[in-house]
Regions:
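Conserved loop->alpha-helix
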Residues: 1-213
Length: 213
């Protein structure tokens, strides 16, 4: 589990694509401290498992499905990525519950500045927007942010300059794709209020007779 509080911005050192997966090597410093092989690190909001450790970087496997369903497919060598280690039991809970399992991809439709904040408008699929509520939490590229406004085609967040400086937001531009993870609490509430219909049992007396029982 993560909290959406980015620990540092790393850079993509290499991307090695195979037939069914890829290996990302990420240059980092802070998140390497006390990290072991098998630990989880969120890379732009996606939970990845460390497979190799180097003095200045770590490597992780990425399945093609993850690449296809996320904005990781847009990364190139040198791309800046937000990094966060999994939250320790005795750690501070500074953001909100982040699973590291993105729901989909959004696109930056607009960026504007006012006296005290930078506003990002994100366009997203209706399947994602159903879980986005005003004043609720959302994770954008691994950053825990508060939704300021919701529109039919997207939503807006207001960020303070400190957040922009400490993440890769300062390198984002209009048209860029970003990973989105909605608040898991909303998903559980929907599941409880609208449970799936029970599956019909296909093991019947007639079927057993046909099979010779």
């Amino acid at each position: 589990m993560f909290t959406g509080i980015v620990e540092e911005v790393g850079t993509i050192k290499s991307i090695n694509r195979g037939q069914h997966s890829a290996v990302l090597t990420v240059r980092a410093k802070t998140v390497l401290e006390e990290t072991r092989i098998g630990d989880s690190i969120a890379v732009n909001g996606i939970c990845l498992t460390v497979r190799q450790l180097f003095p200045d970087s770590f490597a992780a496997d990425v399945m093609h499905e993850t690449l296809n369903r996320s904005a990781l497919a847009q990364l190139t060598v040198g791309s800046a990525v937000n990094l966060e280690r999994a939250m320790p039991v005795n750690g501070r809970f500074g953001g909100h519950i982040v699973a590291g399992h993105v729901d989909g991809v959004g696109r930056i439709a607009n960026i504007r500045k006012d006296d005290t904040a930078i506003w990002y408008t994100i366009h997203a699929d209706p399947a994602i927007l159903r879980y986005v509520v005003e004043k609720g939490s959302i994770t954008i590229d691994g950053i825990s942010l508060t939704v300021a406004a919701v529109e039919p085609t997207g939503f807006s967040v207001s960020t303070i300059p400190h957040t922009v400086r400490q993440t890769n937001l300062h390198q984002r531009h209009k048209g860029d794709f970003v990973n989105l993870e909605t608040d898991v609490v909303g998903k559980y509430i929907e599941k409880l209020l609208h449970p799936e219909a029970p599956k019909q049992n296909t093991l019947t007396k007639e079927m057993l007779l046909r099979c010779g029982f």
